[in-house]
């Protein structure tokens, strides 16, 4: 590698340029994940009509701190619900009364539970559980100051960081954050620690 000495003005310009890039990168992480592009609609919108109100509901007016212990308990309880695929999207009330659900129903119910308990920055995600899967899968991602957590009540009983996953797993296609809709433009960076505004 060749190193060329920089004059004092160039060093200052170089340092300022790096600082500006760092600041811009830091502020953009508070908007939405860089791998998601806002869209007006998704191919799932019509199918999701029964659960649209759940996704656009406000968080509990008195924000409470959602503990990882509580999340693990919710995941364990939802994981225990027998899996049964449904072509129809079930509301949280339907999942609770039927006591069977697919990944969509379990993830929507967890989304509703988290919002009712004051959690913000929660995304409902549709994508692939594994890159080779033929069918899509649904899960949640929760952005916190400690990092982004992956919440999958179909397969997991504990909270895990997105950054801990193999890039060939949990590949997002579309995401829903409140009334906002996103399309994934490329695979999630493995180092993502993003706080979305909601």
PLM feature spans:
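A structural boundary/capping signal
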Residues: 2, 6, 25, 29-198
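Bacterial N-terminal signal peptides that target proteins for export
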Residues: 4-20
């Amino acid at each position: 590698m060749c190193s060329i000495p920089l004059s004092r003005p160039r060093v200052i310009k170089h340092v300022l340029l790096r600082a500006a890039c760092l600041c811009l990168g830091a502020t953009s992480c508070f908007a939405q994940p860089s791998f998601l592009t806002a869209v007006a609609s998704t191919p799932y919108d019509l199918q999701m009509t029964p659960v649209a109100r759940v996704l656009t509901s406000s968080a509990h007016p008195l924000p409470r701190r959602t503990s990882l212990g509580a999340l693990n308990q919710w995941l364990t309880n939802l994981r225990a619900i027998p899996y049964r695929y449904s072509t129809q999207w079930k509301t949280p009330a339907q999942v609770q009364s039927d006591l069977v659900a697919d990944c969509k129903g379990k993830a929507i119910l967890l989304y509703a539970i988290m919002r009712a308990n004051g959690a913000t920055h929660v995304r409902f995600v549709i994508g692939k559980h594994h890159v080779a899967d033929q069918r899509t899968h649904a899960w949640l991602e929760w952005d916190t100051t400690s990092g982004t957590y992956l919440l999958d009540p179909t397969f997991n009983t504990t909270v895990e960081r997105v950054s801990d996953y193999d890039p060939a797993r949990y590949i997002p296609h579309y995401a829903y954050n409140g009334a906002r809709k996103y399309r994934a433009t490329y695979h999630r960076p493995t180092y993502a620690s993003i706080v979305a505004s909601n």
